[in-house]
A protein has these predicted regions:
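Amphipathic, small/basic residue-rich leader segments at the start of a protein or domain
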Residues: 1-102, 123, 395-401
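Glycine-rich phosphate/cofactor-binding loops in nucleotide/flavin-utilizing enzymes
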Residues: 2-3, 87, 353-401
Length: 401
C-alpha cells in the first residue's frame, strides 16, 4: 500500500532547505536574474553543506531508481528520492535558477546515480555533472540523436553538438547521450561521462533566456573527443529489445525532481499572492462555501487544488522510486501536471495582483518567467503525454501517430 507520510528526518532536512531558500536565495534572487551568466559566488559553500545532508536526499536523483545493491524486502520506504523532491521544492521556493547552480547538484548527477557502476559512482563522487541530450536537429526526439560514439581501442571517440545544456559551462562533468550505430536506432543510444578539460570538448556559447537566469545554459561541441572506455554508463551491448531503456531510466529520477522545481516556484507565487490579498481583506481561508466566496478567493482555491494534485503525483513517483517500483509513467504524469500547473498558477498570480504583479517591484513576474522551463526541459508537455499514452495503451510512438 502506498505510503506518503513524510519521515521525521526528511521533514528536518526540508526545513533546513527552506531556511537556505529564505535566508540565502531570496536576498540575491533579483541580483542574479539581472546579472545573467555571472556565477553566484555566494553558493560556493552551499554545495559542501548539501553534500552533508546527503542522507536526507539533498542531491537530485540521489538514490536512483535501480539500486541493485539493495536487498528486496517488504518495507514501505520513503527515502532519498522522497527527500530529493521535498528539498528541491523548498529550494525552488527561494529561486529555481540558483537551485540549479548549486555545485554538485546537477541533472547529470542523477544520470550517474541511476545507472553507474559502484566504481563509476566512487570515481565521479563529489563532482558536478550537467546533462547533454538535446541537439539542433532532434529537439524533443531523443531517439533521433546524431552525436556519435566510436570505440577505438580502450577509448570512446565522441563527435557532435549539444544545445541547451543546463550549467554546461560551470559543471565538472558532462553526461552526453550519443549513438553507437545510427542504423540501430534508439537501441544504440548510450550515455557517456566526459570530464571538463578533455581535448575535443568545447563550450561554444552561452544562451540568453526568459528565466532561470542565475543558471548558465550552454552549447557544447564534441570534436574527436576521446574518453576512457569505462566512462560509458551502462552496458556496451546494443539490445534492440531493451531499446535505450538504460539511458531513459535517468528521466525516472529527474522528472519528479523537475516536478518538484515547479511545485516550489508555484508555491512561492501562491504564498505571496495570498499575503497581498490578505492585506486587501481577501483572506481565502476556506470558511465559506464556494458560491458565497469572493471571485478571487475561488481562484485561490482552484490554484491550491491544482498545486496539491501535482504535489501528490510527485510524491507518489518518488515513493515508487524509493520502493524499487517502475515509475516511468508516473514520473511523466507528475512532470506534466506540475509543469502545467506552475505555468498557470504563476501567471494567474501576476494577473490577480495587477500592475504590481507585472512590475519588477515584486518577484511574481520573475517566478512566472522561471516556471516556464519546468514545462519544457526533461521533456515537453507533449512528450510527457505521449509517454503516458504509450504506457496506458501499450502502443509504440509510431502506432500512436
Amino acid at each position: 500500500m502506498i505510503n506518503l507520510e513524510i519521515p521525521k528526518h526528511l521533514k528536518g532536512v526540508a526545513s533546513m532547505a527552506h531556511d537556505i531558500a529564505q535566508g540565502m536565495f531570496r536576498p540575491i534572487s533579483r541580483k542574479y536574474d539581472k546579472a545573467e551568466h555571472t556565477y553566484p559566488s555566494e553558493l560556493d559553500t552551499l554545495g559542501a553543506i548539501l553534500q552533508g545532508l546527503d542522507e536526507g536526499g539533498s542531491q537530485l536523483g540521489a538514490d536512483g531508481l535501480s539500486r541493485k545493491d539493495k536487498k528486496k524486502d517488504n518495507k514501505n520506504r520513503n527515502g532519498r528520492n522522497m527527500g530529493t523532491v521535498l528539498n528541491v521544492a523548498e529550494l525552488c521556493w527561494g529561486d529555481l535558477g540558483l537551485m540549479l547552480t548549486i555545485p554538485g547538484q546537477g541533472l547529470g548527477n542523477a544520470a550517474i546515480a541511476a545507472v553507474a557502476t559502484p566504481e563509476q559512482k566512487e570515481r565521479f563522487q563529489g563532482k558536478w555533472a550537467s546533462m547533454a541530450i538535446t541537439e539542433p536537429g532532434a529537439g524533443s526526439d531523443s531517439a533521433n540523436i546524431q552525436t556519435t560514439a566510436r570505440l577505438d581501442g580502450e577509448e570512446w571517440v565522441l563527435n557532435g553538438e549539444k544545445i541547451y545544456v543546463t550549467c554546461g559551462e560551470r559543471s565538472d562533468l558532462v553526461v552526453v547521450w550519443a549513438t553507437l550505430d545510427k542504423a540501430q536506432g534508439r537501441a544504440a543510444i548510450k550515455s557517456f561521462v566526459v570530464e571538463k578539460g578533455t581535448p575535443g570538448l568545447e563550450v561554444a556559447r552561452l544562451d540568453k533566456k526568459l528565466g532561470i537566469r542565475a543558471s548558465d545554459t550552454a552549447t557544447i561541441l564534441l570534436n574527436d573527443c576521446r574518453i576512457p572506455r569505462n566512462n560509458l554508463l551502462g552496458s556496451e551491448e546494443i539490445d534492440v529489445k531493451k531499446s535505450f531503456a538504460g539511458a531513459m531510466k535517468t528521466f525516472d529520477n529527474t522528472r519528479p525532481a523537475v516536478a518538484a522545481m515547479a511545485l516550489g516556484v508555484a508555491k512561492a507565487a501562491l504564498d505571496l499572492t495570498r499575503e497581498l490579498l490578505r492585506k486587501e481583506g481577501i483572506k481565502a481561508e476556506y470558511q465559506e462555501s464556494l458560491y458565497e466566496s469572493h471571485t478571487i478567493e475561488a481562484e485561490i482555491y482552484r490554484m491550491e487544488a491544482e498545486w496539491e494534485a501535482a504535489r501528490l503525483l510527485t510524491l507518489k513517483a518518488a515513493w515508487m522510486a524509493d520502493n524499487n517500483i517502475p515509475n516511468s509513467m508516473h514520473a511523466s504524469m507528475c512532470k506534466a501536471k506540475a509543469g502545467k500547473s506552475a505555468n498557470d498558477i504563476t501567471l494567474k498570480c501576476v494577473e490577480l495582483c495587477g500592475g504590481l504583479g507585472y512590475s519588477e517591484e515584486l518577484m511574481l513576474e520573475k517566478w512566472a518567467r522561471d516556471s516556464k522551463i519546468t514545462d519544457i526541459f526533461e521533456g515537453t508537455q507533449q512528450i510527457q503525454r505521449l509517454i503516458i499514452a504509450r504506457q496506458l495503451l501499450g502502443k509504440s510512438s509510431k502506432e500512436l501517430r
